[in-house]
Amino acid sequence: MRIRVERHVQFSNCAIKKKNDLSGSLKLDNLPDTLTEFTAHQNKFSGSVDLTQLPAAMLTLILEHNRLSGSVVLTQLPDSLCKLYLSNNQFSGALDLRRLPSSMFYLFLNNNSFSGTVDLSQLPQGIKGLDLSDNELSGEVFIPDDLFDSVGADNTKIIKRHME
């Protein structure tokens, strides 16, 4: 099944309801400029996704529980993006978390195949939740006390340390 979102459609959010078993690729590069929320979780979408062309108005993107794969560029997300959920897919490659939008407060990347050393030294100040669990990630990371328990790193080689 193919779902096509035309540019002339004016709406602020789009939800592809869960457990529809929708499949195929998910093209996000031509979404309406005014789209603020896009949800496509618990389906069977596959292939890579380009997050570098999301609408400037995008606040929330939920792509959890699919079969999406490939590397993910997180350094060119819209400045407005607050919530990004990519959990339970097959994404891989290194993660660059040094230039996330300053508005970001939830980032869930758990249960994928991301690998390499992570640097959490430049997380947005308002971040409230970050889950990196169940990936092939490593590194020693220093986390402020108020965020320490909100950073998930279970089943990784990440060593969490309290920032002094």
Predicted regions and their residues:
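Consensus "Asn ladder" position of solenoid repeat domains
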Residues: 20, 43, 63-66, 86-89, ...
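Structured C-terminal portions of repeat-based eukaryotic scaffold domains
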Residues: 83, 94-133
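Leucine-rich solenoid repeat scaffolds
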Residues: 120-164
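A structural signal for leucine-rich repeat
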Residues: 4-9, 27-32, 50-56, 73-79, ...
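Conserved LRR concave beta-strand detector
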Residues: 11-14, 36-39, 59-62, 82-85, ...
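Acidic (E/D-rich), amphipathic helical modules within compact regulatory domains
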Residues: 26, 40-44, 49, 59-67, ...
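LRR N-terminal entry segment and analogous cap-like coil->beta motifs
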Residues: 1-40
